[in-house]
Amino acid sequence: MRKVKSARKLGRTASHRKATLANLSTQLLLYKRIETTEAKAKETRKYVEKIITKAKGGTVHAQRIIFKKIRDKAAIRELFEDIVGKVADRNGGYTRVIKLAPRYGDAAKMAVIELVDYHEAPESAPVKAKQDRSKRVRGSKKTQEGSEKAEVSASAGEAAAVTEEK
C-alpha cells in the first residue's frame, strides 16, 4: 500500500530540492537569519534541526556526515565552533519561523527563519525630544526671508541695467 511522504516537493526535482535545502541551510548557518518563502522556511527548519542535532555529537564522523549535506567549509566551521556551543543545553527547537507579509510581485507567503539563540533585540537609539514647532524647517521664516532677499537683489539689478541704458 502506498504511503504519503511528509516532505514538500517545492516544485522541484529531487536533486534541485536537495541543492536548495543545502544552500538555504548554509546561508542560515552563516548569517543566522534569512528571508524566504514559508514552505522553504519550514522545510529548511527540518533540515537544519537534524544537522545541528548531529553536530552536537562533535565527532569526526558527524562532521563527515554533515559535510556530505552542506558542502561549505565556512558554514561547517561556524556550526561546530560557534553554534553547537550556544545550543548545547537545548534539546531541539534551534530555529524559529516568523511569518511575514506576502511578497509584492507574486503574493507568495514569506517568512523569516532564524536561529533562536542568536536573535538579540537591537539596542534602541536614545529617544530625542521633539523640536519646538517654530524651529522646524517646513515653512519657516528663514526660507521665506532668503527668497525675499533674492527678489530684492534681482529687482535692484534690473533697475541698474535700466539706468545704464539711459
Swiss-Prot record:
Transmembrane segments: none annotated. Part of the 50S ribosomal subunit. Contacts protein L32. Residues 142-151 have a biased composition (Basic and acidic residues). The gene is rplQ. InterPro entries: Ribosomal_bL17 (IPR000456), Ribosomal_bL17_CS (IPR047859), Ribosomal_bL17_sf (IPR036373). GO terms for cellular component: cytosolic large ribosomal subunit. Belongs to the bacterial ribosomal protein bL17 family. GO terms for biological process: translation. Residues 152-166 have a biased composition (Low complexity). It comes from the Bacteria. The keyword Ribosomal protein applies. GO terms for molecular function: structural constituent of ribosome. This is Large ribosomal subunit protein bL17. Keywords: Ribonucleoprotein, Ribosomal protein. Residues 122-166 are annotated as: Disordered.
